[in-house]
From Swiss-Prot:
This is Coenzyme PQQ synthesis protein B. The keyword Transport applies. Keywords: PQQ biosynthesis, Transport. InterPro entries: Metallo-B-lactamas, PQQ_synth_PqqB, RibonucZ/Hydroxyglut_hydro. It comes from the Bacteria. Pathway: Cofactor biosynthesis; pyrroloquinoline quinone biosynthesis. Gene3D superfamilies: Ribonuclease Z/Hydroxyacylglutathione hydrolase-like (3.60.15.10). NCBIfam families: PQQ_syn_pqqB (TIGR02108). GO terms for biological process: pyrroloquinoline quinone biosynthetic process. May be involved in the transport of PQQ or its precursor to the periplasm.
Amino acid sequence: MIDLIVLGAAAGGGFPQWNSNAPACRRARADDPAAPSRTQASIAVSGDGAHWFVVNASPDLRAQIGQTPALHPRHGLRSTPIAGVILTGGEVDTVTGLLTLRERQPFTLLATPPVLDLLDANPIFEALDRSIVPRVPLALDQPFALALPDGTPAGLTITPFAVPGKVPLYAESGPDPAAIVENGETIGLAMTDGVRHAYFIPGCARMTGPLRARLRGADLVFFDGTLWTDDEMLRAGVGQKTGQRMGHMSVSGDGGTIDAFADLDVRRKVLIHINNSNPLLLADSPERQVAHQAGWEVSFDGMRITT
């Protein structure tokens, strides 16, 4: 069994974003049923429905745990069903929530070496006592059997793999700070119980041949849904960057996500990490209908999928 809960479906800033007065965010603040609020992207995954691994620790993690009964303490005065946290990158939106988990509660922190190096370089993350929260490096393309803090097998195996992306904004440097790289700075995560296969790829700058081959025939894929069009933030007057500058491919258009997945025979396709400028967030938008007609679902906080 692969049991997944969407803790947060939106991109950085959430929906509505705290400083956005754009029409969609105003609709969300007004509790428009077609524009429900969403917190910042994160999922929880379990092999038994009892012990969970959080994938990406968003700034909203405390609220996300509170809204998710499966992650509530169950035993004694202090406990947690969260056995570990897995990071797919070192962006502010994926690591900040780690500080919420600093209450001397054992769990395992897993990430690729470049991401662990970013954490090591910032002493604030030493608030997570390494004797209680060990940091475990993940090697690209090497299966890793998840285990509970006591060593008991968790029933899931993950395989991290590089996808095209960029370094976090705060780590940009050099002559081409926005260069798209495929070196482990940004990863996707394959998850399997030995029978079913699911993938979590919240950030991806472009589709590649090897990535197409990897995803073909998958049972479930959560994929980067940041922007509907590459220049939507520029056209809306709410930002100065394109999707490519931020390391995200667009959902629509030639070479976009819908186009790239058209012949991959993925059983269930779900968009996640959706920016507040993306009309996909609006249930009554034409763009939402286009995505649905192409076989895509739009994730929402609390969405639960069991394969």
